[in-house]
Amino acid sequence: MDTKDIQKAHGHWILAKMGKRVLRPGGKELTKKLIDSLAFNASDDVVEFAPGMGFTASLTLAHKLHSYVGIDADEDIVRMLSKKLQSAQASFNLGNASQTNLKSASKDKVYGEAMLTMHADHRKSEIIREAHRILKKGGWYAIHELGLTNVD
């Protein structure tokens, strides 16, 4: 979450520093719809890619789950969320969405919001492949992303 050097800081962190709290397409309404559509239950093992400030993680953890893992590449975020959202079934891991180091076929539901949009096409493919790898057979991968359409 380093925003000291504006030339090197990620745009979403600069906006957050300026007070912008909802940095997702469709706002909180679409986030809630995504979470509702996942229909969490007490046996679910869930992974969130790039939980950021933890809004969606807090909605997810309001459900009874078997386990929740948030994977974020920012050490400050992992530390902050580990303190802010303490739960027996939750953990926040420092890592990369394209290489989580989680066991194959071990998760029921994986989701991420507005994070694929920020990556190059080859990285998007790697992240989607990783979601597929860690999902159990019949598991769900839910995303909330920008869609761009050429009007020409």
Regions picked out by a protein language model, each given a short descriptive name:
Residues 9-28:
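Class I SAM-dependent methyltransferase Rossmann-like catalytic core
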Residues 24-42:
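Conserved alpha-helix/loop element of class I SAM-dependent methyltransferases that forms part
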Residues 43-52, 142-152:
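Conserved class I S-adenosyl-L-methionine
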Residues 52-99:
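Class I SAM-dependent methyltransferase SAM/SAH-binding core
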Residues 98-110:
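A short acidic, Gly/Pro-enriched loop at the edge of an enzyme's catalytic core
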Residues 109-123:
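A short SAM/SAH-binding and catalytic strip from SAM-dependent methyltransferases
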Residues 125-140:
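A short glycine-rich, Lys/Arg-flanked "PGG" loop and its adjoining helix->strand segment in the class I
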